[in-house]
């Protein structure tokens, strides 16, 4: 989709074109020599005044060189319509082949003044129109070189096109066009002359619109351009109407509408001019209606918005420069009185000269006043003001040649645009950034007509970005963490196929818990042939809470069977956390079918061993963590105190005490030893030998055990605890290292077995390891038959008999509820 747009660019300085003055003078003498009458037998022009033939030829060349746009053709036809022109073809071709040269405006005014003095009564004193036509060609050509729109033709093509165009223009001759142009030139526009003081706008409009692919360089297009000019000026020729309509579609729509609207709103000061103007307005109105029928209503809206925007900016510029406009009018008043005192014929010639020299101002003047209706008296009174502005503009250009005015280029590519931005109306909806909003750029550019270079474009405004998702933020917050203790237990039943198969028979596992300090004791219960008649073909499996220190416990459980590959199979999990009380069990009455379990093909009983794997998740107390959002959270680095003190122990820096054991010495620090152990603190505080000598002799601990104990004192870790748990327990108890003592108890409890149960119980009793002692007694009571057969048990009977009594006392006080239904008595008959 093409979009209409308006561009404002700065014209090159006029001084850059005034470089070849010698060539200019030679051209002037050549033009005067060519004014002599000459005849030819093969003349292609109509009979008439020969002095006007160069006007037609030159105007036709101008229209041909720019691909015959409507704006330039209108000016050329208006100049040609002042009389029924005819001339010499040879002289016409010489004028066409002459290269265009831009003349100074001051030289042009002097030539006009001299011609009016030497030939006051002959209208043939128009040697300047060919020069003005050459100026009209040269000035846009230089600007087109700056803008990149060159469209020159060869001399032969231009001559042939000029000949055909002259014939078509002669047929379409009408004096009403001259009167209409005189009316348009009579409307005041100081700001237009100040801003557009050159004749470039007309040719910029004609050269910028045609497509490069069009065949505008042919003689047929030249004829259609002339016919199009006649169509806009109210002529009667219809020979090129069809080609003119197509040419208007490919050229500037805005330029053609400006001329059509301006022709319908202008008026004249005399009665004859008013009558001709009304006829031209009627013809132009019908032509404009025929042209507008090819465009959509949206194109009209875009055109009106652009016209209103340009008028508003020109009015603002006129208010900004009231003093300069008034001074220009005052300086040009003598020339205005001279022009007003001349005859009507001389006034018409001057208006034609001004039309050729200032087409851009005429077009911009039409565009500025196309929507206003003025009376005949106002148009007549403004005619002098317009010529005064022209004279003042020329004088200003001579005095200040460095200041180049701006040239307004109107380009409309496609009238079928469906969307347009409010930039044409100078309105910004704040949906774009400042550097992207075209409406904001328009306001900045058009507020100063002397800006260096800017662009005002009408483009599509994108939709606003989606707003960011706002997440709610609370000032206070709370995080509740429910603590869940998870542990597992594996139970292996050897020779499972030999188990008693009576219904309701129960097999019970040993008790287990989540840890050494956990008061919750659990066990598994299995019914090999079901619990009742309903489940006699199944294996029933239950989780039993043996003892607890709470009223109830909530827990979830999961049962599975390990196959020969030690993989979990036939897993069943509780759907929720059940409430357990002491002596209460939960499980599955129909856990697995017996025939499926006993089938060797399934691999669930490798070597006739049933391995049950149980996972328990006990719900403990919940913990609430609360805080406030306004507190700044900093990322605190992890504490490396343990590593730092470990390095201090290894490098032995700043040590002040020596610990010797078995011929080995360890360097240590009194402060650290005293802070970690009460025994060392008492040793260094009192008047003891260790304090005086700064040396501690240890005889009942191995050096490896002492080194591990010292490492724990410095770092809080014991990497080799598993290897020396029993000896390290004794050292921790001696030097009051409670944490190390509990760590040793845990390691010994994990490795508790039938063979080591008696020795572990003796060690726990000797070093007051209460937790290890309780766990060992429970283990002995569970495996009493096996433990009694060991040598350690036999030795404990003789050396530590009180431990045997404690073990049996714990067995007696342990309350285990009856498991399973009571056995029925068998009646003896």
From Swiss-Prot:
Residues 24-36, 122-140, 266-288, 323-353, 372-382, 389-400 have a biased composition (Low complexity). The keyword RNA-binding does not apply. Residues 313-322 have a biased composition (Basic residues). Expressed near the anterio-posterior compartment boundary of antenna, leg and wing disks. Gene3D superfamilies: 6.10.250.3030, 6.20.250.50, Apoptosis, Tumor Necrosis Factor Receptor Associated Protein 2, Chain A (2.60.210.10), Potassium Channel Kv1.1, Chain A (3.30.710.10). Its main location: nucleus. The keyword Nucleotidyltransferase does not apply. GO terms for molecular function: identical protein binding; protein homodimerization activity; ubiquitin protein ligase binding; ubiquitin-like ligase-substrate adaptor activity. GO terms for cellular component: Cul3-RING ubiquitin ligase complex; cytoplasm; nucleoplasm; nucleus. Residues 486-616 form the MATH domain. Induction: By hh during segmentation. InterPro entries: BACK_BPM_SPOP, BTB/POZ_dom, MATH/TRAF_dom, SKP1/BTB/POZ_sf, TRAF-like. Keywords: Developmental protein, Nucleus, Segmentation polarity protein, Ubl conjugation pathway. Pathway: Protein modification; protein ubiquitination. The MATH domain interacts with ci. Interacts with ci and gft/CUL3. Belongs to the Tdpoz family. This is Protein roadkill. It comes from Drosophila melanogaster (Fruit fly). The lineage of its organism: Eukaryota, Metazoa, Ecdysozoa, Arthropoda, Hexapoda.
């Amino acid at each position: 989709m093409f979009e209409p747009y308006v561009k404002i660019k700065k014209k090159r300085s006029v001084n850059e074109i005034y470089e070849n003055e010698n060539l200019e003078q030679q051209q002037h003498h050549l033009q005067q020599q060519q004014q002599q009458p000459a005849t030819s037998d093969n003349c292609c022009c109509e009979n008439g005044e020969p002095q006007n033939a160069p006007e037609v030829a030159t105007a036709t060349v101008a229209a041909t060189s720019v691909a015959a746009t409507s704006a330039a053709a209108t000016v050329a036809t208006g100049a040609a319509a002042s009389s029924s022109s005819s001339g010499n073809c040879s002289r016409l071709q010489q004028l066409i082949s002459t290269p265009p040269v831009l003349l100074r405006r001051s030289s042009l005014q002097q030539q006009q003044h001299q011609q009016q003095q030497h030939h006051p009564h002959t209208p043939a004193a128009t040697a300047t129109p060919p020069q003005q036509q050459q100026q009209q060609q040269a000035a846009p050509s230089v600007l087109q070189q700056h803008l990149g729109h060159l469209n020159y033709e060869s001399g032969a093509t231009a001559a042939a096109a000029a000949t055909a165009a002259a014939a078509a223009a002669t047929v379409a001759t009408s004096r009403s066009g001259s009167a209409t142009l005189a009316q348009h030139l009579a409307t005041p526009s100081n700001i237009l002359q100040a801003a557009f003081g050159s004749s470039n706008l007309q040719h910029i409009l004609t050269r910028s619109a045609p497509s490069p692919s069009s065949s505008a360089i042919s003689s047929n297009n030249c004829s259609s351009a002339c016919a199009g000019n006649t169509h806009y000026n109210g002529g009667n020729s219809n020979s090129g109407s069809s080609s003119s309509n197509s040419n208007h579609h490919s050229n500037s729509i805005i330029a053609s509408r400006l001329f059509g609207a301006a022709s319908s709103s202008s008026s004249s000061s005399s009665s004859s001019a008013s009558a001709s103007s009304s006829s031209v307005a009627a013809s132009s109105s019908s032509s404009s209606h025929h042209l507008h029928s090819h465009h959509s209503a949206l194109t009209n809206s875009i055109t009106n918005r652009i016209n209103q925007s340009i008028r508003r900016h020109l009015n603002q510029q006129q208010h900004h420069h009231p003093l300069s406009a008034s001074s220009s009018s005052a300086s040009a008043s003598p020339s205005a009185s001279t022009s007003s005192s001349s005859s009507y014929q001389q006034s018409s010639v001057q208006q034609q000269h001004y039309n050729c020299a200032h087409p851009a101002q005429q077009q911009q003047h039409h565009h500025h006043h196309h929507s206003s209706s003025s009376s005949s008296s106002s148009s007549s009174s403004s005619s002098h003001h317009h010529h005064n502005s022209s004279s003042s503009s020329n004088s200003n250009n001579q005095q200040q040649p460095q200041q180049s005015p701006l040239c307004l280029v109107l380009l409309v590519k496609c009238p079928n645009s469906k969307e347009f931005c409010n930039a044409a109306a100078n309105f910004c909806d704040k949906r774009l950034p400042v550097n992207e909003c075209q409406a904001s750029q328009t306001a900045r550019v058009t507020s100063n007509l002397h800006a260096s270079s800017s662009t005002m474009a009408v483009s599509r405004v994108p939709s606003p970005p989606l707003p960011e998702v706002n997440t709610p933020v609370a000032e206070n917050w709370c995080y509740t963490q429910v603590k869940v203790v998870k542990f597992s237990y594996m139970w292996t039943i050897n020779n499972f196929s030999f188990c008693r198969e009576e219904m309701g028979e129960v097999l019970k596992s040993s008790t287990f818990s989540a840890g050494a300090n956990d008061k919750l004791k659990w066990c598994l219960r299995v019914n090999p042939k079901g619990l009742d008649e309903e489940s006699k073909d199944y294996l029933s499996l239950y989780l039993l809470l043996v003892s607890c220190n709470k009223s109830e416990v909530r827990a979830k459980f999961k049962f599975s069977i390990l196959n020969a590959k030690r993989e979990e199979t036939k897993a069943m999990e509780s759907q929720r956390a059940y409430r357990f009380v002491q002596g209460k069990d939960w499980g599955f009455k129909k856990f697995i079918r017996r025939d499926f379990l006993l089938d060797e093909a399934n691999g669930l009983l490798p070597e006739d061993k049933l391995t049950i794997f149980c996972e328990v998740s006990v719900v403990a107390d919940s913990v609430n963590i609360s805080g406030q959002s306004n507190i700044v959270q900093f990322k605190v680095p992890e504490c490396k105190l343990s590593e730092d003190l470990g390095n201090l122990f290894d490098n032995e820096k700043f040590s002040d005490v020596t610990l010797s054991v078995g011929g080995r010495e360890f360097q240590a620090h009194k402060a650290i030893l005293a802070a970690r152990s009460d025994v060392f603190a008492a040793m260094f505080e009192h008047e003891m030998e260790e304090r005086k000598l700064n040396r501690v002799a240890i005889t009942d601990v191995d050096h490896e055990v002492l080194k591990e104990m010292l490492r724990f004192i410095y770092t809080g870790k014991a990497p080799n605890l598993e290897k020396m748990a029993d000896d390290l327990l004794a050292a921790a108890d001696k030097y009051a290292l409670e944490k190390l003592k509990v760590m040793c108890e845990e390691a010994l409890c994990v490795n508790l077995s039938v063979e080591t149960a008696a020795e572990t119980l003796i060690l726990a009793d000797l070093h007051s390891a209460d937790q290890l002692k309780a766990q060992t007694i429970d283990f002995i009571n569970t495996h009493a038959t096996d433990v009694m057969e060991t040598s350690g048990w036999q030795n404990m009977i003789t050396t530590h008999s009180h431990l045997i009594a404690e073990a049996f006392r714990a067995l007696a006080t342990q309350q285990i509820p009856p498991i399973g239904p009571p056995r029925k008595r068998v009646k003896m008959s």
